[in-house]
């Protein structure tokens, strides 16, 4: 399945966690969105996970699509499977994934070349509230749970 097939029904939060300094950074894209490849539509509503998610929503397929489309090193980014959020849009269900860089330092130059910058959660005020709530869930999972060790 190609990146073009995957992206309409998925969004990705990109994060980097430095366990030494306990710094958690999130990518913010040039359009102000915190989601790749684009923000959710304003009409999107949170929903429970569907009974049967198809292959287009598979976390590894989404990770591979991001690697392919953005030229990332697959050995440096992991899918955090415990993060399971969904939104209903006019086009159908959208899964929001959390991908975390495992490099010792945040790949700031790489992200900037893609049109984004890394920020701490507190620096993201003014972003869409729905996206900030998703980042708060990611923060709780990574800092307070097992997501930082994945």
PLM segments and residue spans:
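A structural signal for well-ordered alpha-helical scaffolds and beta->alpha junctions
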Residues: 59, 63, 90, 128-132
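Localized chelating/binding microdomains
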Residues: 22-23, 87-92, 114, 130, ...
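Amphipathic alpha-helical regulatory segments at dimerization interfaces
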Residues: 2-4, 68-69, 84-86
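An acidic, glycine-rich, mixed-charge low-complexity segment common to nucleic-acid enzymes
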Residues: 1, 31-32, 76
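Acidic, metal-coordinating catalytic segment for phosphate/diphosphate chemistry
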Residues: 1-20
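Conserved Nudix-box catalytic region and its N-terminal flanking loop in Nudix hydrolases
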Residues: 18-72
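Active-site-adjacent beta-strand/loop module that shapes the phosphate/pyrophosphate-binding cleft
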Residues: 75, 81-117
